């Protein structure tokens, strides 16, 4: 044979061996999965599901429990009779396919069987859990019934032993106890006839009702005590306080009808008792709170009247004296005004105000007479009288404050006049000092605007003297002239300082600039202009500015240096 044929034979043999090895491997894997399925099937089949179902059957369930059990039982019958046989058939088919080397079909069959058994395992687990819940519910009912009955028995015993604490509510409590007992009987019937689920619901309801009734019984004694003892006692005390209030000649405000309010309180007390018998505890509490609030409101009315009476008795006894005191003050104030007006002109209408106070006093006097008559008649609540008394007192206090204010104003007129006189004399002295100071400067003359300012200020001061010298002084006019004169003097002093400083500096700078006059034509011209402004125009500010600029041309900084030396050594003028 040729080498090519040999190679082909070898390759073919290798392929056959490889395929055989693959087939054996695939068959082995599928076989392992089939064996695992067999084991899972046997384990599932060996579970004691039937025994568990048979034990529940012996419980003879009825009602809702029986319906649930039938559903689980039917599901188990379907599994055991149909699903297991179908699973056996699928596993057998997979074995046949695997043995005949139909690997891919065998794998599909195994996969289907695995999915089927997984679903069956879930179903069996669900059946077992459902059956176990029925059994567990029965056990829970058996355990819980005793606890619930103990709660009920304890509650019934407590109510029976303390019946006197519950008053008329005892009848309603016994009705609720009877209803709970009926629920327990219903539970026993359901549980004994094999319906643990519905029985559990009834037991839960009975226990909830027992706990709720226990909570109610714990609150009732407190409400009973409040309704039957505390509130009646409080109302009795309120009635006694009311009788005492009336006996002591107190009058209630028109909007307070004591009998209606007492009847209303009694009605709310009866309503709270009725609501308690219906176990409307929240509404009972609301009614009792309302009673408490209205009782306190009545007491506050009584207290307000008591307090008002004390105030009326304390203040009304001195009202006449207070009015007379203010009236005397008013009379004296009018005399003082008449005396003051001989020397001063009053511009504040003080006399008109004081006469107005007199009229107001007459009105208040009439009010006081009426108040005293009402007090003696005992026909008006003291709270109303107290407000009127307070109003009169407040009015009298306001009048007295205004009287004092006017009196202080009148007393201060002499001081204001004296102060103005001193200021006028000081200004007159300062004007003379300014005049002498300027004259010492030996200036060729004074600018017109400065002279106008000086003479205007002098006229202001003379006007002030003139007003002060009148027979009757208008202090407002005086004060105005003082203010204006003060401002004028301030302006004049500043103008005097600027004028004299610039005049002296202009002379000093001109003398200093003369050293450059012969050698510098600009300086010569600047000196000429500065002298013209100084001697002819009497413009000392202009002369100072002109010579300062001229010096800056030939010797920068000279004007500033000379000015600095001047201000450093300059003595303070006498007028400052």
UniProtKB/Swiss-Prot annotation:
GO terms for cellular component: plasma membrane; septin ring. One of its GO terms (biological process) is division septum assembly. Residues 1-7 are extracellular. InterPro entries: EzrA. It is a single-pass membrane protein. The keyword Nucleotide-binding does not apply. It is found in: Cell membrane. Keywords: Cell cycle, Cell division, Cell membrane, Coiled coil, Membrane, Septation, Transmembrane, Transmembrane helix. The keyword Disulfide bond does not apply. Residues 27-576 are cytoplasmic. Residues 105-134, 254-305 form a coiled coil. The chain crosses the membrane at residues 8-26. Its main location: membrane. Belongs to the EzrA family. Negative regulator of FtsZ ring formation; modulates the frequency and position of FtsZ ring formation. Inhibits FtsZ ring formation at polar sites. Interacts either with FtsZ or with one of its binding partners to promote depolymerization. This is Septation ring formation regulator EzrA. It comes from Lactococcus lactis subsp. cremoris (strain SK11).
């Amino acid at each position: 044979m040729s080498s090519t044929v040999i190679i082909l034979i070898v390759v073919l043999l290798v392929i056959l061996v490889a395929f055989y090895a693959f087939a054996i491997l695939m068959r082995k894997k599928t076989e392992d999965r089939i064996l695992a399925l067999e084991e899972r099937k046997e384990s599932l089949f060996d579970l004691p599901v039937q025994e568990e179902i048979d034990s529940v059957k012996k419980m003879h369930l009825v009602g809702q429990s029986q319906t649930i059990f039938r559903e689980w039982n039917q599901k188990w019958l379907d599994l055991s009779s149909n699903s297991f046989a179908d699973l056996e058939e699928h596993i057998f088919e997979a074995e046949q396919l695997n043995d005949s080397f139909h690997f891919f079909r065998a794998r599909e069959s195994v996969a289907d069987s695995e999915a089927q058994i997984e679903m069956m395992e879930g179903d069996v687990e669900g059946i077992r859990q459902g059956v176990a819940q029925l059994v567990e519910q029965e056990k829970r009912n058996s355990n819980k019934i005793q606890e619930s009955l103990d709660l009920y028995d304890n509650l019934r015993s407590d109510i029976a032993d303390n019946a006197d604490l519950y008053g008329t509510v005892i009848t309603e409590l016994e009705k609720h106890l009877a209803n709970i007992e009926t629920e327990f009987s219903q539970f026993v019937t359901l549980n004994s006839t094999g319906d643990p689920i519905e029985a559990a619901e009834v037991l839960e309801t009975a226990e909830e009702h027992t706990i709720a009734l226990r909570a109610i019984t714990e609150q009732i004694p407190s409400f009973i005590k409040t309704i039957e003892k505390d509130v009646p006692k409080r109302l009795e005390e309120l009635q006694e306080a009311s009788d005492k209030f009336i006996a002591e000649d107190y009058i209630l405000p028109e909007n307070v009808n004591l009998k209606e309010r007492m009847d209303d309180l009694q009605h709310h007390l009866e309503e709270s008792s009725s609501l308690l018998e219906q176990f409307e505890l929240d509404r009972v509490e609301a009614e009792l709170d309302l009673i408490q609030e209205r009782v306190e409101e009545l007491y506050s009315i009584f207290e307000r009247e008591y307090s008002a009476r004390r105030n009326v008795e304390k203040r009304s006894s001195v009202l006449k004296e207070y009015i007379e005191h203010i009236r005397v003050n008013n009379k004296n104030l009018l005399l003082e005004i008449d005396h003051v007006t001989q020397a001063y002109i009053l511009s504040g209408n003080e006399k008109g105000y004081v006469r107005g106070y007199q009229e107001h006093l007459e009105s208040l006097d009439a009010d006081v007479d009426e108040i005293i008559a009402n007090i003696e008649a005992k026909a008006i609540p003291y709270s109303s009288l107290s407000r009127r008394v307070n109003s009169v007192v407040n009015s009298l206090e306001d009048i007295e404050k205004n009287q004092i204010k006017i009196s202080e104003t009148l007393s201060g007129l002499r001081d204001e006049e004296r102060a103005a006189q001193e200021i006028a004399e000081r200004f007159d002295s300062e004007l003379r000092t300014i005049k002498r100071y300027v004259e010492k400067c030996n200036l060729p003359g004074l600018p017109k605007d400065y002279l106008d300012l000086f003479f205007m200020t002098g006229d202001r001061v003379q006007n002030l003297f003139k007003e002060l010298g009148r027979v009757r002084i208008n202090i407002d006019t005086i004060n105005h002239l003082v203010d204006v004169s003060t401002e004028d003097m301030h302006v004049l002093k500043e103008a005097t300082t600027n004028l004299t400083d610039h005049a002296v500096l202009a002379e000093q700078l001109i003398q200093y600039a003369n050293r450059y006059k012969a050698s510098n034509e600009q300086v010569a011209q600047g000196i000429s202009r500065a002298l013209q402004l100084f001697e002819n125009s009497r413009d000392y500010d202009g002369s100072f500015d002109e010579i300062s600029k001229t010096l800056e041309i030939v010797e920068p900084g000279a004007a500033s240096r000379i000015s600095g030396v001047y201000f450093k050594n300059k003595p303070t003028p006498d007028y400052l």
